């Protein structure tokens, strides 16, 4: 087990490293980065408050979609960044709901909330919806950014991967939920490759 002192020291190191990076950015990005602290500070409470803690995680964890753009451009283009942010948040909802199904019995016993418990037997319907929202957000953002044809091919492959996850996952099998959760590294790699290839093609 991790002691409170060790956890506090680790947190301090992480905050210090984050601050060091943030101070290298433009003023707009500094403000945007600092504004995420409200989400970071309140997220740990969400499992006690709402049936949708995974949604709050999505908003918190993917703030970098906004911050990365701002760090490069010094501003935000809402037509590019908002669909990307919502796409990433929807993806987080999908994979963290799958992850939460590993712990649903324990969560129910101790009285904490999750989308896995909230959706129950309808989980796969919700997962399909989150996958569709994530894909739509990526396509909208890519079109606004002027990405080339390889982007759309890559997103199609990524969408097929999400569809496989949703169709194939056994939500009552902890090991399978863990496998599907870990497979999101493949999904992320496909999206990254799609963006890079689309940017290179669009630049031409």
Predicted feature locations:
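Solvent-exposed interhelical
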Residues: 1-19, 88-140, 169-181, 185-188
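Intramembrane alpha-helical segments
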Residues: 1-83, 140, 163-170
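A short hydrophobic/aromatic micro-motif that marks alpha-helical segments and, especially, helix-coil
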Residues: 18-20, 41, 65-68, 75, ...
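Alpha-helical transmembrane segments
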Residues: 28-35, 56, 79-91, 126-129, 136, 147-154, ...
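Alpha-helical transmembrane segments of multi-pass membrane proteins
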Residues: 40-44, 87-92, 99, 157-164
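Extended hydrophobic alpha-helices typical of membrane-associated regions
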Residues: 140-204
């Amino acid at each position: 087990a991790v002691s409170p002192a060790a956890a506090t020291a680790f947190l301090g190191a992480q905050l210090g490293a984050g601050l060091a990076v943030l101070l290298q950015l433009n003023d707009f990005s500094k403000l945007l980065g600092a504004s995420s602290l409200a989400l970071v500070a309140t997220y740990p409470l969400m499992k006690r408050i709402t049936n949708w803690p995974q949604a709050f995680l999505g908003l918190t964890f993917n703030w970098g979609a906004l911050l990365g753009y701002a760090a490069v451009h010094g501003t935000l283009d809402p037509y590019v960044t908002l669909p990307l942010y919502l796409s990433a948040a929807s993806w987080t909802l999908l994979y963290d709901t799958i992850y939460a199904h590993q712990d649903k019995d324990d969560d129910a016993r101790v009285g904490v909330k999750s989308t896995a418990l909230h959706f129950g037997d309808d989980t796969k319907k919700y997962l399909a919806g989150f996958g569709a929202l994530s894909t739509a957000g990526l396509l909208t953002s890519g079109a606004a950014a002027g990405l080339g044809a390889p982007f759309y091919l890559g997103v199609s492959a990524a969408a097929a991967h999400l569809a496989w996850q949703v169709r194939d996952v056994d939500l009552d099998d902890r090991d399978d939920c863990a496998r599907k959760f870990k497979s999101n590294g493949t999904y992320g790699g496909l999206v990254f490759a799609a963006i890079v290839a689309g940017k290179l093609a669009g630049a031409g």
